[in-house]
């Protein structure tokens, strides 16, 4: 069996780089570890951390293909972050004009 130790990082392709960068850094407070513009790909690569732990690799591309947005579609459904209070976190996001779903617990 492969001995996994932890999740190293999650790669996300965004459609609006500046908006996504602002969301992860200014709204969620992730720290920028490294930001690189890759001329050959006309693409940014942004490495982000929570508390010095590298967790998200954010990419931008000129015209990425759309993915289904239905919750039941195959692929990454959501990211979940640990916070002290889910309700307060939801209010904070809404106050920063971030669209959120109602809080629910999977059975």
Task: Name these PLM-found stretches.
Residues 9-11, 47, 78-80:
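Short aromatic/hydrophobic contact patches that present stacked aromatics
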Residues 16-18, 71-107:
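Vicinal oxygen chelate
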Residues 12-55, 95:
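Core segments of cupin and vicinal oxygen chelate
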Residues 57-59:
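Conserved beta-strand in the GNAT
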Residues 4-7, 76:
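Core-facing hydrophobic residues within beta-strands of well-ordered domains
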């Amino acid at each position: 069996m492969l001995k996994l130790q932890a999740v190293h990082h999650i790669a996300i392709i965004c459609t609006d780089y500046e908006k996504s960068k602002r969301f992860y850094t200014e709204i969620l407070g992730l720290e920028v570890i490294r930001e690189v513009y890759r001329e050959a790909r006309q693409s940014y690569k942004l490495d982000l951390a929570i508390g010095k732990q590298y967790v998200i690799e954010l990419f931008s591309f000129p015209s990425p293909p759309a993915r289904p947005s239905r919750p039941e579609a195959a692929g990454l459904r959501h990211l979940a972050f640990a916070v002290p209070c889910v309700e307060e976190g939801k209010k904070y996001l809404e106050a920063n004009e971030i669209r959120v779903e109602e809080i629910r617990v999977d059975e």
